[in-house]
């Protein structure tokens, strides 16, 4: 699989190597593999090394001519470094330690490089937005320059995880820590491409007589009111989807679906009550009995069960969201989504006649043929239009909403969630047009029937409301 991927990659970039006059000066075969090795002590170190050596050999055999390098925390070189590839230390601010560890794993010599120098940090939903003072970033930059250490800012511009592209981490307190839609990162250049005080501090440090002027901001607009004129219950869309029938709930992968949502449905011919256990939830679910909301279950908060009462001839519905795939550490290979283990009620495994409805939301839902049917505490799609005389970047204000995604002119601009700290969604002006524009919002919780939406001129990325997600 890696060889097939690398072959396609090589064919696209082979002429872009510096040896052929292009911009590619080095190639990294793995990213922070040492972190994975450290967490997978059940696998012998020599087996890990065989894997990473094979990866670099494939790259070499294809014809890459530029130097290879690895990228790990300085304390993880034992698992990540590889002979023939320059070891670089992510996030290492101690010059002496950097040189010591690189010398140890690179035949007593440099060059010395920090492949990931963090001027900020990524953020997860329901957690504080990390920041770093401009003077701290500038001071560390000067320290590297004074000691002839090469470095790469990660990130200089973070940007946005549009659509379903955001990843995730995990820790002891949370089985998943989904990344926010915004990847602003408190980087020198903001999510919307603005120069920040941090950028100006670095520019002052690095500028020469030939440094060009800072570009002007892209035009910014505010949309004071977007009327939402149609509300459609997600069940109405589900009714037009052919279900997959199985004895047990199927994962996203078994359903050949990568992103979005799956609606799991089970009809009961006999009543049952007790504790509903969904230990295999990946990642977020709202549970309904006969259309009435019973509970929210959530992998971030490790909430996997609730009390439930299913009467005679009732229907249990569980709408599950994939909140993003873990992309760091040993759990990168445990990334199935949906319901991945049995559903249990009152100690009884629930099998037989499960229905799965695939809702990947890979395209903006077409609500033209549907009548208004949205209700409070039901998964609901909202549609509206707005007219612009001019276009520009803007930020949709989602502070009054619960959890969901937004499409504008057919483009999924990302997830929102009331827990924060992100409360706005960046909407680039290039996706807007003069005249009529269309918006569709899928609101999963729908605790209030919404009538309108607005956009504002500045982002809100530090408004944390974690209690709203519990």
Q: Model-predicted segments: where are they?
A:
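Edge strands and adjacent loops of beta-rich recognition modules
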Residues: 232-265, 358-382
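A cross-kingdom feature marking solvent-exposed beta-strand/loop segments within repeated
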Residues: 175-176, 180-184, 198, 250-254, ...
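Glycine/proline-rich low-complexity spacer/linker segments in large multi-domain proteins
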Residues: 321-352, 446-470
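Aromatic- and carboxylate-lined catalytic core of secreted/periplasmic carbohydrate-active enzymes
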Residues: 179-233
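Active-site neighborhood of glycoside hydrolase catalytic domains
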Residues: 2-81
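The substrate-binding groove and active-site-proximal loops of carbohydrate-active enzymes
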Residues: 1-4, 30-49, 86-93, 118-136, ...
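Aromatic-lined ligand-binding clefts that engage carbohydrates, nucleic acids, or primary amines
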Residues: 274-288, 316, 386-409, 416-417, ...
